[in-house]
Curated annotation (Swiss-Prot):
Keywords: ATP-binding, Cytoplasm, Helicase, Hydrolase, Nucleotide-binding, RNA-binding. It is an enzyme of class 3 (hydrolase). Component of the SKI complex. This is Putative ATP-dependent RNA helicase C550.03c. It is found in: Cytoplasm. Residues 494-514 are annotated as: Disordered.
Length: 1213
């Protein structure tokens, strides 16, 4: 076939025109004849389609057709994308359809930058654990957000009755739309019979109307086959919460469990335990485990050492069984480290997250502080997807003024799939708190409380070297013991010389020059003076406890300084044998082996080494972290017999002793000295008594000069613990984090706070009342449809204003000297009280009992037989209404009575003063009442001259005179109103008043449940103005660059530090100087030593003060109440560790930097660790800004300070 093709080509005569056309399929050597190979190649090339046409061919082939333009398509409905879909709401295991709701359609490209849904794509691996400030937080609760969006308050603020937005972003108000009936209009929109399909031609689409859907739902049980077509293929059998089934009943989310009753069938309820325990569980533990197995959230409140950790451990085991994660949060980092060690022994896959440590961050059990979890939630960390349980330990720290807000934020922000486990000491309002958590998360919370202690306590007073029992193990206060202690205290002292202290003066002077000992010596008196005062007390007390076999003992001292002083009084006391000394030596050597040689020689380590070998120790915030951990480990092993500790030791892992001693019953709370609260006493005393070892625990209260009174002791020992009180407050970081996303408004966060719990709990009831009032108002308006009440309403408003001005006049008058004389004995008054009809009375002297909002006066009043209100009682008591008042009160059968009335109920103070027997009336003597009745015998109506108003001209008060003038104007206005003389005036006035009252009730309740009634809303608006003034947000409250930088700052003052970063103020300082300057953002302790700094650092210090003053001036201008937000650099010693941090960054040893200040070593370490966190946040801020030089600088600063003992790994790791 190919040869025939070649022959055909050879016969073709190629013309010039053809050569041009075939230019693309032949070469220059073509002479009119082709070989077989060439012909085959050219034919294949010619027949093979080219990927592109030549320009000449395109010009020849392109053609444009003219078409007629039509506008009919503009009248058609466009094909729109469905943004929502209708989902059925089901209930019960059978999935019974109970209703339907409209839900948004999912967007295909969901990611952490545009969606808060759990269906979004995961972010990068680097952001899995910590998240990013550019991420959107996961939605806290879909149903709750829907409920909030549907509240009347939100609709009034943003939406019209038809659900359409009316307030554009940035506008304070929207369009003023005329009121319409939502239901009627909505039904009209969905009524196909009312659609005019002739006017509009729409595309062929099948609509399912609401009416059709409702008909299907009505017949769901009888016509099951018809509904099958509408059912989705995958049926969900998830049970809906009760709130979706009964909209009129407010669900009770908190359920109190009776933990005193034993669970006989626990094995049947939980046949396969996720974690087996080697001991018999208590009832409250069984209850908690059962509810965890059922997927419920629990709130466990029990005494210290009662076994709450069992619940936490079981939740961790359950998470591992379900292949999910459990997060354990604690108030402080040290507690997280301790729990990490304990959990590591029981569970394999355990991790910990702190500011500077990240161990196994993808473990099934993660330990962290509550602040770290809050940061993860705001940053939308993907790790949250896998979390099944969050365990909040020491929940009673929600009462903490500074950090309590963190607990509330985390609970509010947690996703709905997370099960909550709340562990707390015993508090009186557990149900109230659980109810708030349940309402916020739409979860049932089971409250499991136990007042039973595993080891009962006995309480003693230590007086004159003797113990006097004042409370026995059954909780009974022993008055005989208290009297005996009091009698012993009153006996004269015998001079006693403490032989144990002859060499104690050498204690700390020989150890070191500055730091701990020097600081201790600088207090109020030297160590010697303290020893002379307290030596005998502690020597005899410890000797007595040793003889009575009551060691180990924890002595709670509410001062770091006195902890050191008291232990110095026991210099010659040795409580450990040789074997115990050897064990102590091994533990210490093993612990300090991780330190550099120079750090092992620190005076504090040497001092504690000697002290621990004798079985003595101290534990407070001034110790190095490694020293505190050594003390804790040795105490748990029973190698510390006497421990002087501050109250922070009472919080945390189980470290019980045989006895507990209180060095006093007062503490300084930062403002003044006060008695210990019952909760604080209970928390500390709970360390007494070792479960399984001691029959009872011993608690001793030290008494030196005088005993506390019995009432104080009873309250402290046996009184209820402090209630959980909300410490929720707004911070700039919280506001900016919520403004950058749209899923949760600040108003919603405030509504969900514990502080708004009472108000928000009443919202459903108020909504029901509003609905009821609206129905009554609608019926009333139909009844009044034929009556023109325009003039009546004008008269009514004037009457109500008259009443208000009268009340204001009386309240102002009674606060002045001349006005008070008017309210004298015998003065005639006209008054009404609540539902009591208008009547007359006589004041009995000037005996006035005043409270915050009203005054109470003694009167003799005319008591009618029928005291129900009459139509004329709705009118103000003004002369204009004299002809329409009901005068039935003056019937001769009515008698006078004695009583108390409120000042707010007085309608007129009359000019008449009667001579009465006040004492006889108070004593209810009949003669006194008869004489009074005789003086009123001739009075028949209110228009009598007897009721002429008193002359107020002697009252000299501006507000009184202002109200008096306005009331006179209204009096004249009412007198000239002809409507008063019409025949049906009272009837029409009563109808108008009823309408006015219903409308007022609706407005008041609507205002009560609206956002404008939120307690913290004014503070929010003021902080918004501050942020706008500083340029963190714009007029539409969109977060700007400054705001995004401030979102990175969590551990200190975000405003001041952001200003420094964006003004590039730190660029002129070296890394060491930057470290010194930033130390001012984390140091907040007292110091008497002024740091020595260079002129350049002094310039930087003045720069920080200048920026802080600028920020504070703006806050003061907008009246922002800032509490402990780190903005006060002037009045607080914020710059006390500048020299220390500067030299540390330059490489000076820790031993030498302690000589530069009187601040304790532990406080120095804590400051540098917090400084590292600030540097890390500054590095993140530099990344947001795009400043690579600053990013590198902050990284270098971190490397300079992260060394040696300051960043020594925890012994618990």
């Amino acid at each position: 076939m190919s040869s025939k093709l070649v022959d055909a080509i050879n016969e073709v005569a190629v013309s010039n025109k053809d050569k041009i056309e075939l230019d693309g399929i032949k070469d220059d050597s073509f002479d009119g004849h082709l070989s077989i190979t060439e012909a085959t190649y050219d034919v294949d090339t010619f027949l093979k389609p080219s990927p592109a046409l030549s320009k000449d061919w395109i010009r020849k082939l392109q053609k444009k057709w003219d078409r007629e333009i039509t506008y009919k398509g503009l009248y058609e409905y466009p094909e729109t994308l469905a943004r929502t879909q209708i989902r059925f709401q089901r209930h019960g295991l059978e999935g019974k359809i109970m209703g339907y709701k409209e839900v948004p359609e999912l967007i295909e490209d969901l990611n952490s930058k545009n969606s808060s849904s759990f269906l979004r794509k995961p972010s990068s691996k680097n952001e899995f654990v910590r998240g990013s400030t550019s991420n959107i937080p996961f939605l806290a609760d879909d149903s709750d957000v829907d409920a909030i969006a549907g509240e009347p308050s939100v609709k009034m603020a943003l939406y019209g009755e038809d659900g359409l937005l009316q307030v554009p972003p940035g506008f304070s108000r929207g369009l003023s739309m005329t009121a319409t009936s939502t239901t009627d209009n909505l039904n009209d929109e969905f009524d196909p019979e009312k659609w005019d399909t002739k006017k509009v031609k729409s595309s062929n689409r099948n609509f399912v109307t609401i009416h059709e859907l409702n008909e299907h739902l009505k017949n769901v049980n009888s016509k099951h086959s018809e509904i099958d077509d509408l059912l989705p293929d995958k049926r969900s059998i998830v049970s809906l919460p009760p709130s979706t089934l009964n909209l009129h009943k407010q669900p009770d989310y908190a359920h109190v469990v009776d933990s005193s009753a034993p669970i006989e069938n626990f094995q049947q309820l939980v046949p396969e335990m996720a974690l087996d325990f080697p001991f018999e569980l208590d009832n409250f533990q069984k209850e908690a485990i059962y509810h965890l197995e059922m997927g419920d959230s629990v709130f466990v409140a029990a005494h210290t050492s009662a076994g709450k950790t069992v619940v936490a451990e079981y939740a961790i085991a359950l998470a591992q069984k379900h292949m999910t994660k459990a997060i354990y949060t604690s108030p402080i980092k040290a507690l997280s480290n301790q729990k990490f060690r304990d959990f590591k022994h029981k569970f394999e896959d355990v991790g910990i997250l702190t500011g500077d440590v990240q161990v196994n961050p993808e473990g099934s059990c993660l330990l962290m502080t509550t602040e770290i979890l809050r940061s993860m939630l705001y940053r939308g960390a993907d790790l949250i997807r896998d979390v099944e349980f969050v365990i909040f330990d020491e929940v009673h720290y929600v009462n903490d003024l500074e950090r309590g807000v963190v607990w509330e934020e985390v609970i509010i922000m947690l996703p709905p799939h997370v099960t909550l486990i709340l562990l707390s000491a015993t508090v009186p309002n557990t149900k109230e708190f659980a109810s708030w958590v349940g309402r916020t998360k739409k979860k049932n919370i089971y409250v499991i409380s136990t007042l039973k202690r595993p080891v009962p306590l006995e309480h003693y007073l230590w007086v004159k070297q003797n113990m006097f029992k004042i409370v026995d193990q059954h909780g009974r206060f022993l008055m005989d013991g208290y009297k005996s202690a009091n009698d012993a205290l009153k006996k004269p002292d015998k001079p006693v010389i403490a032989k144990d202290n002859k060499n104690s003066a050498r204690g700390r002077g020989a150890a070191r020059g500055r730091g701990v000992q020097t600081n201790m010596m600088r207090g109020r008196g030297s160590a010697k003076s303290v020893e002379r005062r307290d030596a005998n007390t502690w020597v005899h007390l410890i000797g007595h406890l040793h003889k009575q076999n009551l060691l180990p003992v924890i002595v709670f001292v509410f001062s770091k300084k006195r902890c050191e002083e008291y232990v110095d009084t026991l210099t010659n006391r040795d409580l450990n044998n040789h074997q115990e000394k050897s064990e102590v030596h091994v533990v210490i050597e093993k612990a300090v082996a991780r330190l550099k040689k120079e750090d092992r020689l620190l005076p504090q380590i040497g001092r504690m080494r000697e002290m621990l070998s004798r079985g003595l120790a101290v534990h407070h915030g001034g110790l190095l972290p490694i020293i505190k951990e050594i003390v804790e480990i040795l105490f748990q092993r029973g190698l510390v017999k006497v421990l002087f500790a501050t109250e922070t030791f009472a919080m945390g892992v189980n470290m019980p002793a045989k006895s507990v001693v209180f060095s006093g019953t007062q503490k300084h709370d930062g403002r003044n000295f006060r008695d210990l609260l019952p909760g604080e006493y209970t928390q500390c005393s709970g360390r007494a008594g070792r479960r399984g070892l001691d029959v009872t625990g011993t608690v001793i209260i030290l008494s030196r000069s005088e005993l506390p009174d019995t009432a104080s002791l009873r309250h402290m020992i046996m009184g209820p613990s402090s209630k959980l009180i909300s410490q929720f407050r707004l911070t700039y970081n919280m506001i900016l984090n919520l403004l950058r996303v749209e899923t949760l408004r600040i108003e919603d966060m405030i509504k969900r706070s514990f502080s708004e719990n009472v108000n928000q709990t009443l919202v459903p009831q108020h909504e029901e009342k509003i609905k009821s009032f609206e129905e009554k108002l609608s019926a009333l308006k139909k009844e009044m449809s034929d009556v023109d009440l325009k003039e009546i309403k004008s008269c009514l408003l004037s009457s109500e204003s008259f009443k208000e001005y009268t009340k204001k006049m009386h309240f102002r008058a009674i606060t002045t000297a001349n006005g008070k004389r008017i309210f004298k004995d015998g003065r005639v008054i006209v008054f009404q009280q609540l539902d009591f009809t208008r009547t007359v009375g006589v004041l009995l002297g000037t005996s006035i009992r005043t409270n915050a909002s009203d005054c109470t006066l003694e009167v003799a009043y005319l008591n009618p037989q029928n005291n129900l209100k009459r139509p004329s009682d709705l009118l103000a008591f003004a002369d204009a209404f004299n002809d329409v008042y009901d005068n039935a009160i003056f019937d001769e059968s009515n008698q006078f009575k004695y009583g108390l009335i409120n000042l707010s109920g007085i309608e007129r103070v009359c000019n008449t003063i009667l001579r009465i027997d006040s004492g006889g009336i108070r004593d209810r003597r009949g003669g006194a009442f008869r004489k009074l009745s005789e003086q009123f015998a001739s009075i028949k109506k209110f228009s009598d001259l007897l009721f002429e108003e008193v002359n107020w001209s002697k009252v000299r008060d501006f507000e009184f005179c202002e109200a008096f003038e306005k009331r006179n104007f209204l009096q004249n206005k009412l007198s000239g109103n002809p409507i008063i003389s019409t025949p049906n005036f009272l009837t029409h006035f009563a109808l108008a008043y009823q309408e006015y009252e219903l409308e007022s009730n609706i407005d008041n309740l609507s205002s009560y449940i609206s956002d404008q009634n939120l307690e913290l809303l004014p503070d929010y608006e003021q902080r918004i103005k501050v942020l706008q003034e500083l340029g963190y947000i714009d007029a539409e409250r969109t977060v700007l660059l400054k705001g995004r930088v401030a979102c990175e700052i969590n551990s200190t003052s975000e405003l001041v530090l952001t200003e420094l970063i964006l003004e590039n103020s730190l660029a002129d300082f070296s890394c060491e100087e930057t470290i010194a300057l930033l130390s001012a953002f984390v140091f907040d302790e007292k110091t008497e030593v002024e740091p020595t700094i260079s002129p350049h650092l002094q310039k930087g210090k003045e720069m920080i003060l200048s920026v802080a003053e600028k920020v504070n001036q703006i806050q003061e201008h907008y009246q922002v109440l800032y509490f402990n937000e780190g903005n006060d650099f002037e009045s607080q010693p914020r710059f006390g560790l500048m020299e220390v941090c500067y030299e540390w960054a330059r490489g000076m040893s820790f031993n030498r930097i302690t000589d530069l200040t009187d601040v304790l070593e532990g406080s120095i370490v804590r400051t540098i660790i917090r400084l590292d966190e600030v540097l890390r946040e500054c590095r993140g801020a530099a990344r947001v800004v795009g400043d690579s030089s600053m990013y590198t600088k902050m990284e270098e600063c971190q490397n300079l300070i992260r060394r040696n003992i300051v960043f020594c790994p925890s012994l618990y790791m």
